[in-house]
Design a protein with these regions (language model features):
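Conserved helix-loop functional segments at active or binding sites
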Residues: 2-10, 16, 36-43
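Glycine- and other small-residue-rich loops at beta-strand/loop junctions that grip anionic moieties
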Residues: 16, 23, 51-54, 114-117
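Alpha-helix-loop-beta-strand connector modules within alpha/beta enzyme cores
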Residues: 23-51, 101-108
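Conserved, mostly hydrophobic/aromatic
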Residues: 15, 34, 65, 121
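Structural preference for beta-strand elements that scaffold enzyme active sites
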Residues: 10-12, 46-50, 72
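Catalytic cores of alpha/beta
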Residues: 55-69
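Flexible, glycine-rich loop/tail regions that form catalytic "lids" or insertion modules at the edges
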Residues: 1-2, 7-10, 61-62, 72-77, ...
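Short, ordered loop/turn segments at secondary-structure junctions
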Residues: 16-18, 54, 70, 77-82
Length: 243
């Protein structure tokens, strides 16, 4: 705060120079916490938050950072991956043009996100916090995402720190390939997907054959799958008629 009052206008928050024995903080949480601290000090408009992070890889992640106060985002890891893909021959063409294409994709994705909220300029989206937290405790919300709804509460700083520690430990495993995870695409023994290959294959079989037993197999897979969404926690009161 004293540096900003002295005339400095750029604050760079970076997770680039991480080391093996340190656990990096989540860039979104850090951005939100610093943003709200500057607001509380009455100097937020006197400084710009530059976020240099490997966390931001798609337009949604960039939108979240900007929505919680980032002035601009530099996704260094995404650019490093692009350079590596070009160098290894997996991505053809000029590396600079590949970066430009990636940036263009981010821009279009951001515009789509903004337009859904009726916003046409990034300055109107910055710090708007047009989000609702799912699964974050009050202590996290009050420090990092003040004013955001978190109806079901959830993970504490200790929980989130444990997750970060796992990621940090995996990042520094020697001679081990990077774990791609299963967030976007089904990967065996990774994150659960409600529409996994077993469910889809059984649905196709039931539709193509028209056999009731095949349909029952599909229905049993759907009805017995673990809780993966909030709506899966709801249950209809079928024993009480409303008539």
């Amino acid at each position: 705060a004293s540096s900003i009052r002295a005339g400095h206008t750029l604050i760079v928050l970076s997770d680039k120079n991480i080391v093996a024995d340190k656990v990096p903080a989540n860039a979104i949480m850090v951005t939100g916490a610093v943003h709200h601290y500057l607001i509380a000090q009455g100097i937020r408009t006197d400084a710009n938050l530059i976020i240099e992070t490997g966390l931001a890889r798609d337009s949604h992640q960039v939108a979240v950072l900007i929505g919680f106060g980032a002035t601009c985002v530099y996704p260094y890891l995404a650019y490093d991956v692009i350079d590596d893909l070009v160098a290894s021959g997996e991505l053809l063409g000029d590396p600079i043009q590949a970066r430009v294409n990636f940036r263009k994709g981010l821009d279009k994705g951001l515009l789509k996100i903004l337009s859904k909220m009726g916003i046409s300029t990034i300055v109107s989206y910055r710090g708007a916090q047009l989000f609702e937290a799912v699964g974050l405790s009050e202590e996290v919300v009050n420090l990092c995402f003040k004013g955001v709804q978190s109806r079901i509460k959830g993970a504490t700083f200790a929980d989130l720190a444990a997750d970060q520690a796992i990621l940090a430990a995996n990042a520094f495993k020697r001679r081990a390939p990077l774990d791609q995870g299963g967030l976007l695409k089904f990967v065996f023994n990774k994150e659960y997907h409600a529409f996994n290959p077993d469910v889809i294959n059984s649905l196709h079989t039931a539709v193509r054959t028209g056999d009731y037993d095949n349909y029952r197999h599909y229905a049993d897979l759907v009805n017995s799958r673990p809780v993966a969404t909030l709506r899966a926690l709801l249950q209809l009161k079928t024993d009480n008629s409303i008539d």
